[in-house]
């Protein structure tokens, strides 16, 4: 498929139970969904096989951490685009279409991310990445929608696409050719 959504999982059965249904519901027609098990010791692998048999699994022989786990898993995935998605992200209708359209339209972009809203208060941005990030003149990272520990309410102020310096790994779409 053109898009592979790869969810790195380590003992995250509860997160998969809560958030994977939205990924399957809103993505299965447009993407291959893959859960990469980073040496999980819970029964998330068995649960996944029973509840979502069409979701592909990659089983890693040890826990390689976040970056290492994704690197090992993505070597086993063939797709034009990768989406790295945390197992605690709930997606919504059309989320994937908009990302694909953005990347297809701007061939010079290596990656993009959507706005991320908090699962606890859907009117506020998510702390982990909000709406993309920048560096200030001192090299300190900050993101649209969050300054230090304070997150903004989403009032549509970041609905316009813009260039960012960094994107969060919580939900990152990247061209596979640029990843490697």
Predicted regions and their residues:
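Cell-envelope/extracellular polymer assembly enzymes that use nucleotide-activated donors
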Residues: 2-4, 32
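Short, acidic, metal-binding catalytic loop of nucleotide-sugar glycosyltransferases
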Residues: 21-30
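A recurrent flexible, glycine/aromatic-enriched loop bordering the glycosyltransferase active site
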Residues: 137-143, 148-174
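Short beta-strand/loop segment that forms part of the nucleotide-sugar
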Residues: 30-39, 58-60
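Short aromatic/hydrophobic "clamp" motif used to bind/position activated sugar donors
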Residues: 82
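A conserved acidic beta->alpha catalytic loop
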Residues: 22, 37-46, 62
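Conserved donor NDP-sugar-binding/catalytic core segment of glycosyltransferases
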Residues: 90-140
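Glycine-rich, basic loop-to-helix element that forms the pyrophosphate-binding segment
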Residues: 59-77, 87, 98
């Amino acid at each position: 498929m053109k898009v592979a959504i790869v969810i790195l999982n380590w003992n995250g059965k509860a997160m998969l139970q809560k958030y994977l249904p939205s990924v399957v519901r809103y993505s299965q027609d447009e993407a291959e969904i893959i859960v990469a098990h980073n040496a999980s010791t819970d029964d998330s692998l068995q649960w996944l096989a029973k509840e979502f048999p069409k979701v592909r699994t990659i089983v890693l022989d040890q826990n390689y951490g976040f970056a290492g786990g994704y690197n090992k898993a993505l070597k086993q995935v063939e797709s034009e685009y990768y989406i790295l998605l945390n197992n605690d992200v709930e997606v919504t209708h059309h989320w994937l279409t908009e990302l694909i359209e953005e990347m297809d339209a701007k061939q010079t972009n290596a990656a993009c991310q959507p706005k991320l809203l908090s699962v606890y208060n859907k009117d506020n941005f998510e702390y982990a990445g909000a709406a993309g990030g920048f560096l200030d003149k001192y090299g300190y990272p900050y993101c649209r929608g969050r300054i230090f520990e304070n997150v903004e309410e989403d009032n549509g102020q970041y609905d316009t696409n813009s260039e960012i310096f960094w994107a969060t790994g919580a939900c990152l779409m990247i061209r596979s050719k640029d990843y490697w």
